[in-house]
Design a protein with these regions (language model features):
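A non-catalytic alpha/beta surface segment that caps or lines the substrate-entry region
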Residues: 46-107
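PDZ/PDZ-like domain micro-motif
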Residues: 257, 350-364, 383
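Conserved PDZ fold ligand-binding element
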Residues: 357-377
Length: 410
């Protein structure tokens, strides 16, 4: 399907498109066209192994071809298929055999090293496991999660194809199966179509469509190479405030590459109340924000172009993993990952969970759980690790200028 056709579909559907002045900005319009199509009801939530996933994969392959990339999937195709056993819930005795597919496009500059730039394109269909929807099954369009990341990846590919930064080759990947457990990226990492020993670094774009007014961009993996902080500390792009964290392990596809000793970064504009709900729609995406994020990433690639192979550094994931895995209870709140102050700010409260029952609200900043002072998200997780189901605790929060005690029963 030609992109102009997709644009007309959006127009006829009455979708709020960019203003005439914004349309002059071709990259901005391109981002919107990609997000609008990938997050349309036509694709029914892009569930891995379903028809909507296939349609999304075909669109990405078409875009790669349009940009002049080379196919880098199995047998010279755009695709790399992987089989998996789908279970509707973890305790199901039997599963359903399914096949998902990664989409791969390659920019060959004749270089020794290859940079991998990826974004998952699958989502939750009509509300598979992981959905936070409390109502009837409904299409989860996943505009921010992760049509935004795919659109950003395509914009980066378009810029790099113009001839900049030619000291690396570039492999662009649309991963599937991320929502079910990083299936696609794990499969590629174990069955690569390039020599991973020559992979310079990996950049993962997952949920980059909700840049806030402060322009805070969360970047994890900054400890996986000494080069990252050296370069990023000197970057000043469009007012972006980079919030760096070291760990190479997280709930997204960069983890699969970190575990192969490849330096990684994960770019993320933050959680929101539409996360994993049917309301994550294209009209809520900050397209100018995506453009700023891609400008930042392109500037980072520019700075690294003459650096040669990046050194890899293991991060302290074992300790963080133990703390994260230790808790058996949850408050049922979504952390604000781009919050830079002390404490753990709540970005969403899930109905029917202990936090909601105790009266916690969006914007509350948790500063203590029981006797555990909370200065960051890791203190928060460590505090939760002290409790089991049925226990009670006093959770202390800042709400504006007020400090409030809330009793929570887990």
């Amino acid at each position: 399907m030609q992109r102009i056709g997709i644009f007309l579909i959006a127009l006829l559907a009455g979708w709020p498109l960019l203003s005439a002045q914004q349309m002059i900005n071709a990259p901005l319009l391109g981002l919107q066209v990609d997000v609008v199509y990938l997050s349309s009801d036509l694709l029914e939530g892009r569930e891995t192994g379903k028809e909507g996933e296939t349609m999304a994969a075909q669109y990405i392959a078409h875009r790669f071809q349009e940009l002049g990339l080379q196919p880098k999937g199995a047998g010279g195709s755009w695709y790399q298929s992987f089989d998996f056993n789908y279970k509707a819930h973890p305790h199901a005795e039997e599963g359903e055999a399914r096949t998902g597919k990664n989409v791969l496009g390659y920019l060959d500059n004749g270089a020794e090293q290859t940079v991998i730039i990826g974004a998952h394109y699958d989502h939750l269909g009509h509300g598979i496991m992981g959905s936070l929807n409390a109502g009837d099954p409904a299409i989860h369009n996943g505009a921010d999660d992760n049509a935004s990341g795919v659109a950003a990846m395509l914009r980066i590919a378009e810029d790099l194809k113009k001839g900049r930064d030619k000291n690396n080759n570039y492999l662009f990947m649309g991963f599937s199966g991320e929502e079910m457990g990083l299936y696609g990226s794990k499969y590629f990492a174990n069955n690569p179509t390039i020599n991973l020993g020559k992979a310079n670094y990996m950049l993962n774009l997952d949920m980059v469509g909700r840049l806030n007014e402060e322009k805070v961009l969360a970047i994890s993996g900054a400890g996986t190479s000494p080069a990252w902080k050296e370069v990023m500390e000197g970057l000043s792009i469009g007012g972006i405030q980079a919030k760096l964290s070291d760990s190479g392990i997280g709930p997204s596809d960069h983890t699969s590459f970190y575990l192969k000793d490849i330096p990684v970064l994960h770019f993320f504009t933050g959680q929101h109340t539409d996360y994993h709900k049917p309301s994550d729609d294209a009209e809520l995406v900050n397209y100018q924000g995506i453009l700023l994020v891609t400008d930042y990433i392109l500037a980072l690639i520019d700075e690294l172009d003459d650096n040669g192979p990046l050194a890899f550094t293991k991060t302290k994931d074992e300790e963080e993993g133990k703390r994260a895995a230790a808790f058996k209870v949850t408050l049922g709140v979504m952390p604000d990952y781009v919050y830079t102050g002390e404490g753990m700010r709540i970005d969403g409260v899930i109905d029917g969970r202990p936090g909601a029952a105790a009266g916690l609200e969006n914007g509350d900043i948790i500063i203590r759980i029981g006797d555990m002072e909370v200065k960051d998200i890791y203190d928060y997780m460590e505090g939760l690790g002290k409790y089991k189901v049925g226990d009670k605790a006093i959770v202390v929060v800042k709400r504006g200028e007020e400090v409030i005690d809330k009793e929570v029963e887990f």
